[in-house]
Amino acid sequence: MAQVTLYNIKGEKIGNIEIADEVFNVEPNLDVMWRYIDMQLTNSRAGTASTKTRGEVAGGGRKPWPQKHTGRARQGSIRAIHWRHGGVAHGPKPRNYLKRLNKKMKKLALKSALSARFQEGNLIVVSDIRFEKAQTKQMREVLKNLGIADEKVLFVLPRKEEVYENVKLSGRNIPGVKVIIADNPNNGNPVNIDGLNVYDIINSSKVVLTEGTVRKIEEVLSK
């Protein structure tokens, strides 16, 4: 099994922990990661864009001028697509953009993304991060202690508890910092680690996990 340095929130090394090779040290599959991100971003589209065709725009039922003897180009309706205030040809209509991936591919994509960050040396594991109250100052201090104050950072916390929600709130006003709850049942994640996703991992230069998060991810992705 691979080993990773364990830090506390003061940035001090307090030991090493083993992490599962089959989760954090696989060969990244770029194709599957792309498919996951494509699915994720496509599914985030509302699909509500709508335009009116010439038949749906109000008015235009009367021919604007006679067909002949005016010297003007013949026109059948003031709602034709080339008229101002006319309809739109081939414009968007409400549609469902839903894409799916099977569970095996979703798991492989998550493993690939986590492994890529680990192999680059951009995966940081801390013993735990708990705040008794939400305070941006505390989060800035943690970032400074870990030497990642100027990085784009993703924090993944193990479960939904008040002390972890406070961490999430503490990071929301810091540019480049995102905090997600791995065990959040309201976030709609495909493999029951709700909140953890490939796009956020790849979109961050550093990924910070707690030891509890590591074990939770191993539990789900090793199945």
Curated annotation (Swiss-Prot):
Entry keyword set: Ribonucleoprotein, Ribosomal protein, RNA-binding, rRNA-binding
InterPro entries: Ribosomal_uL4 (IPR002136), Ribosomal_uL4-like (IPR013005), Ribosomal_uL4_dom_sf (IPR023574)
Domain of life: Bacteria
GO terms of biological process kind: translation
Entry keyword annotation includes Protease: no
GO molecular function, one term: structural constituent of ribosome
Region called Disordered, residue ranges: 47-72
GO terms under cellular component: ribonucleoprotein complex; ribosome
Record bears the keyword Transmembrane helix: no
Subunit structure as annotated in this protein's UniProt entry: Part of the 50S ribosomal subunit.
Biological role: One of the primary rRNA binding proteins, this protein initially binds near the 5'-end of the 23S rRNA. It is important during the early stages of 50S assembly. It makes multiple contacts with different domains of the 23S rRNA in the assembled 50S subunit and ribosome.
Family assignment from sequence similarity: Belongs to the universal ribosomal protein uL4 family.
Record's protein name: Large ribosomal subunit protein uL4
Annotated source species: Fervidobacterium nodosum (strain ATCC 35602 / DSM 5306 / Rt17-B1)
